[in-house]
Regions:
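Short capping segments at the starts of secondary-structure elements
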Residues: 23, 34-38
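Conserved segment of winged-helix/HTH DNA-binding domains
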Residues: 11, 75-100
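Glycine-centered, phosphate/nucleic-acid-interacting loop/turn motifs that mediate DNA/RNA or nucleotide
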Residues: 64
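Hydrophobic residues on short alpha-helical segments
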Residues: 26-32
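Short, Lys/Arg-rich nucleic-acid/phosphate-binding segment
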Residues: 22, 70-76
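Key DNA-contact positions within bacterial/archaeal DNA-binding proteins
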Residues: 51
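A short acidic, leucine-rich amphipathic alpha-helix
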Residues: 41-45
């Protein structure tokens, strides 16, 4: 899958550093890197409200950072191929944020 690295860097920067929900989205991405999960599993493991997790999953899926399989409640989420291939960009953004 061909992706413009600069555009992806800007998108990830906005999703993670440029919005109030960025830290939560970063945690979701890190969790999904480890293992695919559904919204309820994420909410439980992250100690977050289910609706909050659903909101962030929707944002990440609309921006093609994650993908899903299944319907509604039972849908499992995982990193998209684009995100898997470019995960290092995400790590770079996190490292820059943590150094500040």
């Amino acid at each position: 899958m061909s992706v413009n690295i600069r555009s992806l860097r800007h998108l990830l920067g906005w999703l993670i550093a440029g919005t109030r929900g960025g830290p939560t989205r970063a945690r979701i991405i890190e969790n999904l890197k480890e293992t695919p999960q559904n919204a309820n599993q994420l909410a439980t493991s992250m100690k977050l409200d289910y609706k909050t997790v659903r909101h962030h999953l929707t944002v990440l899926e609309k921006n093609r950072i994650i993908s899903s399989i299944g319907d509604k409640y039972g849908a499992s989420y995982f990193l998209s191929q684009m995100m898997e291939e470019n995960y290092v960009l995400f790590e770079e953004i996190l490292n820059k944020l943590w150094k500040k």
